[in-house]
Structure formats: C-alpha cells, structure tokens
C-alpha cells in the first residue's frame, strides 16, 4: 500500500498494489498474473513489464504496456483513462459500469453493461471492439484503421481510411468514418445503421437497413443476401450499389449505380433530378421519383411506382421492359423493348431508335412520340402517335378508338390490328388493315400512299389536299375539297367512292369491280369487267373502262360525261349528255328519263340505245340499234355508212345521215332530216310512217305512209307493203313498190316510176292522187317496152304488137298493155283525170 504521497515505484511479484490520494507512478518489473492494482485518487500511471500480464486496475489514469500480451481489466467506472498496451496481442475489459477511455495498441476491447466511450489514439489494425450493452461509442484515430466492432452504437472515424467490420448484429447504431476512403462490413445477422462518410459498405446474409446522414459522393455498397434497405440523406449523393432490395433517396440529386443484379427490388430516389444506372445483369426493379434511368446490356424490367414528369429512361441493350405507374406520366425512353402504361394519361417520347418495341399505355389519353430514327413499334392503347424524321413502322396491337397518328417525314407504314378501328392519320405512306371494320381519316396530304384495309367493312376519308393514293379493300372512300388521284389495286365489291370537290381521278385494278362513285371526274378501268354506279352529278367526267365487259349507271342528275371502252351505260331520271371518246363495240346504252344526248366518236361503232333523245354519230360507219321504243328522239349518225335498227316494239325517231334504217314489228314513225347519200329504209311490219324533211334518195320498204320534203325526193318503194306516199314540193321521183300504193307527187315536176308489172298490176292498181299532165311524168322501165309505145286515149286496147295505154274516164284508170296483145297488163288510177288530160308526152320509157 502506497502512502498519500506522489510515489514512483517499481514493483515485482506483488499481487495487489493500493495507492492513496496522490499521483502514483508504478512500474511492474515482473510478470503480473491475476493481480489487482488500485492507485486511488490522483493522476496515476501504471507501466506493465515486458511480460504476458493479466491485471485488474482501478484508480489509474494511464496504463502503459510494453511488448507482450497484456490482459487488462478495468475494475471500476473510469473517465479519461489512457491505455496503451504496446506490442503483443492485448485485451482490455471493462468490468465495472461504464468507461471513458483512450486506447492504443489493444487488439481486443470488451465493454461493460452501460455506456462506454472508447477513443483510439493510435492506428488500430485488426482490433476487435465489443462494448456490450449500453449506448456505446467508438472514436477511431486519424490513422488507417482496421477494426471489428460489436455492440457499439456510435462509431466515429478519423481523417484516414478506416475499415470497420460489425462482428454481430448492429441495431440502431450510427457510424461516421470521417475523411478518407472508409469501408464498413456487416455481420451475417444484419445491421440497422445510420452512416456518414463511408465509401464502401458490405453486407452479408442478414437484413440490413442503412441510412445515410451525410452526403455520399463516392459510395460503393453491396449489402449481400437478405432483405436490405438503403436510405440516402437529403444531399447530392453518388452511390454504387449491389444487393440492396430497397433504395430510398433524399430531396436533392441522387446518382445511383447498380453494380449487381436487382431482382424485385424497390428504388425511390425522392426529390431532385435523380439518376439510376442499372448493371449489366437481368434486373427487375420498381422505381419511384427517379428522373433518369440507365440500363445495362442485359434484360431490364423496370416498374415506375410514382409519377414521372420529365424522366429519361435508357435501358440499353437487351429485351427491356418498362411499366409506368397509374399517374399522368411524361417520360423520354431509349432502348426499351416493351412499355406498359396504366390507367392515366402518359406521354412517352423515344430518344433512340425503336426496333421491335411494344408499347401499351393502357387507359387514359396517352401520347407516343417516336424519335428521328427508323423505328419499328407495336402500339396499343395510345391515343396520339407522332413519328420522327425517318421511316417509322407502326403496328397497332389493340383496338384503336379515335386515336390520332402522325408519323412525320420518311416512308412510314401503319398496320392496324384485327379490331374495329377508328384512326386519324397524317404523313403515313403505307396503311394496312387486317380483318375488321376500319375507319381511317387522313388529315394530311397523301403523296404516293398505299392503303390496304383488308377484310371488313372499311372507310377511308382523304384530307383536303391534292392526294395521290393507291387503295385496296376499302368499302367507303371519301375525298376532300381538292384534286384526288386514287388507284385501286384490289378487287372492289360493293364499294362506295366519293372524292368530293376538285378534279379527281380514279383508276381501277384489273379485277371484276362493282362500285358506286360520286364526284369523280376521271375514271380509268382495268382489263376486267367493271360495274360502276354514279351516286352524284358528273359535269365533266371522263371515264375509260378499258378491256372487259364494263357497265356504267348514271345518277338521277343532269350529267355530262365522256366515256370509252364501255359496254353498258344506264342513265338516270334527268338529262344526260354522254360522249364516247373511243370505239363502241356492242355497247348497250339506256339513258332513261330526261332529255338525253349521246355522241359517238369517229370509229366504226356498234351500239344499242334506249331513251336517248339526241344521238350524234361520228365520221365512220355507225351501227345503232334502238333497244327501246323511241319517242321523239333525234339521231344524226354523221359521215360513214351508218345503220339504224329500230326497236321491234316500234319507234318514233328523227334520223339524219343514216344510210340504212331497219324497223321491226311495231309501228314506226321515222323522220329523215338529212342524208349524205342513198338510203335503204325497211320499216318492217306494223303501221309505219316515213317523213322526209329534205331532199332524200332512198329505197323504202315496210312504210305504210311516206311523206316527202320540200326538196327533191328520190324514193324507191321496195316490197309489197301498200304505201301512201306524199312527196311534197320539189321535182320528186318515186318508184312504186309491189303493194297497192297511193302516190301524191305534190308541187313540182314529179316522176312516177314503174319498173315491173307487179308494181301496179291489173286488179292491184296504184293510185296517183295529183298527177299533173304537162309537168308530171309516168316513167316505165325499158324492160317492159315492146316495140314502140302509143297512147290510145279512151279507145279500147287492141292487139297491136307494141306497148300501148288507154284511159277509162269513168274509173279514172290508165290501162297499160306492155306486150301489145290488146290486154292490159298494168292499171294506174289517176285521181280526177280524163283521157283527154293525157298525151304521149306524159309517158317516158327509160
């Protein structure tokens, strides 16, 4: 026992040393094993000898070891004790309740049951600190320390690089390793810790909860297995993480790089313009409040759990998938192969080429904007699609109900899904439908576009521009207010095409087409049979139907149309004006009601016409057949050797320049207004009338009534029909037929010609109602003349051996004996005439 003085002693082989109230300095000269040293009050110092010492101390402010393995136990609560145990594998244990110590060169420190404060004033390499119960604190010195820590609630580092390992579960502690490149490793049982100034964090198999209370500028954390969570502070943080299942950011800018695969993990980087970079692994991550997400080279699956309003997501290589949250999102993406939206309105912009991407933005009013690349995407549930500057290929994977698509510049292609779609389209060069009813409206000019809407009852509406488009499988096509040029590349069956205002053109494909057309100025058919019905007025139409047996039906309007290569034409209820620009061969034309007009081209035309009020032929030979009973029509067949065949039911027509007119079994009333040469007219059976309005040369058969013109008419009556002929003014010539004819020459010097006995045989006499001796002449063919001819007046005929004639005043009958046998071979009744009225000069033989 030392006295109450300032003592300095060296002791040996003493098991217990007790000091007093002053400062004692004790040096152990021999090994101390199991002894107790209590130097009492004062500022005491103990120096251990160079032995493996085991000592329990109390009331000592400084303990110095030398070079061996010392085991020191603090027997009482201490404050301000300094322990430096020097070399060797040293141990320090706090036996009493609580210690505040500064230590150096101690490899193992064991704390007490209450709060301990341990400060290192020398480098610690491989030391272990277990401060037991209580709210303990470990302060590392400004050295490069390597320590294992257990049951320490607060660890504070220095200005150098510290390496700290938790030796057991860490619950609720705080670690601030200060300056330097510091490293912290967790025990396999997990840790709940608040960190600052730690550059590397490593976890094991336990569940770790790491919260950063200071800015992180270069953190690398791998929390290993378990359900781990990392919370960043409200600072500008930069971290590299692996094996963290939940990452929470602060209110400022966080930059997070994932260095390991993430599977089912959750990341919420809070406020600020945050950035997340995924590793080159197959990642599955749920992300919130992250403005920039960068993927690696593998397959990334990213789910956004919060609204993004200015996000950029580039998932790099691999078949990546992005799922948006149920918010109004605005995001820019790149290298994402699958994008799925939710129930709100999303705006997605592609910042890189999309190749084979699938985009389904779910409910809401969504918008997709493609970048200026050659993009290929499949899109569903997007209300607005905007393309870029290059060629975009867009396929709709779901039903389109009122969406707007503008693919911008480039040779773009749009494929609709197999649904009943309604879309508004601009700047798309190719549109393809599948099998349902599509309603497509173009809002921009179509130049060289190709549109095939596939099966179903489809509708296409063009915009008010000068459009050039090739279409197929469109059942209803509506043009705009400008000129549209439409080519149909597939068969049309029952389609309706109305190209609206403008000078429009429609070209049909080489198929058997059936369609209804309105407001198309030019129609060009193919090589097969086209059946076209006009649903609107045509005022200046030009239609060329090409090869095939084609049919055109006009609408009930006042139409003006030029046609070619048309086999059947049907008019409407109003006045139609039809001009054939090409040869008509076997064409059937029925212009129906209205005052209609048909003009044939300068070809050898063959047509059957009905209900045409005015027909004009060309300069070549026309063959015209009336397919219906004509009533008041005018037909001028022009130059050429033309033929007109009347309808069998009877016709009333005015004809000009028809070289041959043939009637049927009905009653015909034919007026010939002009002729370019000799005519052949056979009006067939029925009660027929022929009226001439200008000088005509014609052979006529089957006409019961013939009325001449004021000009010179040269008529040859053919056949046995009993004709009533009135030739009017002019020096006319009529050759009697084989029937019992009634002939009226009218004014002028007329010739009544007989070329055969049967033309006015005995018992079948013709009647000349107005024979004027001195001006009119009875002309007989020389083939009937025997010898000479004499007129015998009222004398009875006798056998003279030469031709002779006599007149019976009672019956006003001229008897002609052509062979001179004294018997009349012919009889001609001359109304109102007597034998004295006639003379030899009234007869002519030629």
Give the role of each language-model region:
Residues 5-13, 31, 51-55, 78, ...:
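Feature detects tandemly repeated or modular, low-complexity segments in exposed regions of proteins
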Residues 43, 138, 181-184, 411, ...:
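Short, basic/low-complexity N-terminal boundary segments at the transition from targeting/disordered tails
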